[in-house]
């Protein structure tokens, strides 16, 4: 349907003088981004003010123009903050909406603001400014989660639990050591976040549409005013680059993968089949039919939202893969995946930073589980090696002992010394197994024996926590 009589066209687009008829109503709605790019409003104003100050310094616009622009922008900011700004679909996006209102308020000075600038470099600047602020917020929230993990790990540096491989009981570890594994993951995430921030903190403004501008602009002045570390080196790349958005979504995907792994374990541990932890009611929900249920909805949703963030990354990669230089309208589609990834990561981290300190640990259940499944079998093999037996022979001997215990429905620690020697097939070499072996076969002895950097011994866990706090 044609929109020639539509009220949305009462305001002409900034480019409409070239065309003989107004944009079709459906096309107008299809191409407008004002429905989602309003969140750029404050950074758009900041970028415009820095640009205007530079134009005045370079005598491209007058001091009076600058004063008028500053006054008008102050009013626009107040209107937006008060929810009184009238966004116009016909003006397409946040940039033209603000510029139109500015011109309405201050006249010709508003029309001069866009001198030496294109929406191409303007939106690229807004996107970086907005993402930088979001990255800084996420970095703080991620730090809060890391602190929460350190604090909980410190409380449970000596709490014994089973370590698993293939989701089968493998060896005894401490819960603090287990939590510190996630601290390491999230620390790598924090490092990646800092790296990508440093990489994209360059100013695109000044690239104009794609080739730069004929005006004697000072890009370094604008970069300094907006807190950028420098300017983009190539005008074509400046307006068409979305690597930073892709890189953020890659960071977000890896971080959410870590969150998802933690979530999966929280879900398992909360299950009565494990019974290792409990979560506060405020992080769980019930069932509409089963009155006994307490469901771990937060970790389940975090696990599910991980796929959503993966999708945001794939959307951006696909968006960019076939674009020739420089800017194309395709790039309008970069925002919603990025916004979604930022929002999902921030919300997830906030909830987990609040939830982790309130995890109730059921230490007795953890230790009991660690005492099952022959978790100290490797310790027995190591003991035999230290007595002079080759490791493969020791491995085979302990495997025989485990098989014997399975047949008798008992644990290694239930055997007497002579029974243990016989079960290992070493009754003809009694010197290889002495009474001291039973200390090593306890889960406490097993954990305490891992006395090296990165090991699960409580002293080593506390040392790792100390290093972690120093690195925050």
From Swiss-Prot:
Keywords assigned by UniProt, alphabetized: Amino-acid biosynthesis, Arginine biosynthesis, Cytoplasm, Lyase
PROSITE patterns: FUMARATE_LYASES (PS00163)
Localization annotation: Cytoplasm
Organism, scientific name: Polynucleobacter necessarius subsp. necessarius (strain STIR1)
Top-rank taxon: Bacteria
Keyword ATP-binding attached: no
GO cellular component: cytosol
Key word rRNA-binding present: no
Protein name: Argininosuccinate lyase
Membrane-spanning residues: none
EC number(s) per entry: 4.3.2.1
Catalysed reactions listed for this entry: 2-(N(omega)-L-arginino)succinate = fumarate + L-arginine
One Gene Ontology molecular-function label: argininosuccinate lyase activity
Record-linked Pfam families: ASL_C2, Lyase_1
EC class name: lyase
Similarity-based family: Belongs to the lyase 1 family. Argininosuccinate lyase subfamily.
GO BP, sorted A to Z: arginine biosynthetic process via ornithine; L-arginine biosynthetic process
UniProt pathway: Amino-acid biosynthesis; L-arginine biosynthesis; L-arginine from L-ornithine and carbamoyl phosphate: step 3/3
HAMAP family tied to this protein: Arg_succ_lyase
């Amino acid at each position: 349907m044609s929109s020639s009589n539509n009220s949305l066209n009462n305001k002409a687009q900034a480019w409409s003088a070239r065309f003989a008829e107004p944009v079709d109503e459906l096309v107008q709605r299809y191409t407008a981004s004002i429905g989602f790019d309003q969140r750029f409003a404050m950074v758009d104003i900041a970028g415009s003010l820095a640009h205007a100050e530079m134009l005045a310094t370079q005598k491209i616009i007058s001091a009076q123009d600058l004063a008028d622009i500053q006054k008008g922008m102050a009013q626009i900011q107040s209107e937006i903050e008060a929810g009184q700004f009238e966004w116009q679909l016909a003006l397409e996006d946040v940039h033209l909406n603000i510029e139109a209102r500015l011109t309405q308020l201050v006249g010709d000075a508003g029309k001069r603001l866009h001198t030496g600038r294109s929406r191409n470099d303007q939106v690229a600047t807004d996107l970086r400014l907005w993402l930088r602020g979001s990255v800084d917020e996420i970095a703080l929230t991620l730090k809060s989660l890391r602190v929460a993990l350190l604090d909980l790990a410190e409380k449970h540096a000596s709490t014994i639990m089973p370590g698993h491989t293939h989701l089968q009981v493998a060896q005894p570890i401490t819960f603090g050591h287990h939590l510190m594994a996630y601290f390491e993951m999230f620390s790598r995430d924090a490092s990646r976040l800092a790296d990508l921030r440093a990489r994209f903190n360059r100013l695109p403004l000044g690239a104009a549409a794609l080739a730069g501008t004929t005006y004697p602009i000072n890009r370094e002045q604008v970069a300094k005013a907006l807190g950028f570390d420098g300017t983009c080196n190539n005008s074509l790349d400046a307006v068409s680059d979305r690597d930073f958005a892709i890189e953020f979504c890659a960071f977000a995907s890896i971080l959410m993968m870590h969150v998802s792994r933690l979530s999966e374990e929280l879900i398992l541990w909360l299950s009565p089949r494990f019974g290792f932890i409990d979560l506060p009611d405020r992080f769980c929900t019930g069932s509409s039919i089963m009155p006994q249920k307490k469901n771990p909805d937060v970790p389940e949703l975090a696990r599910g939202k991980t796929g959503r963030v993966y999708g945001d990354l794939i959307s951006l990669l696909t968006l960019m893969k076939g674009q020739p230089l420089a800017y194309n309208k395709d790039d309008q589609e970069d925002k919603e995946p990025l916004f979604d990834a930022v929002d999902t990561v921030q919300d997830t981290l906030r909830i987990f930073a609040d939830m982790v300190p309130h995890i109730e640990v059921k230490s007795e259940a953890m230790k009991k589980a660690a005492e099952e499944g022959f978790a100290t079998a490797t310790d027995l093999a190591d003991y035999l090696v230290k007595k002079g037996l080759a490791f493969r022979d020791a491995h085979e001997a302990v495997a025989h002992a485990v098989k014997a215990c399975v047949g008798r429905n008992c644990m290694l620690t239930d055997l007497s010394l002579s029974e243990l020697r016989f079960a290992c097939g070493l009754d003809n070499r009694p010197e290889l197994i002495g009474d001291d072996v039973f200390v090593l076969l306890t889960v406490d002895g097993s954990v305490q024996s891992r006395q090296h950097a990165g090991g699960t011994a409580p002293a080593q866990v506390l040392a790792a926590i100390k290093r972690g706090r120093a690195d925050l």
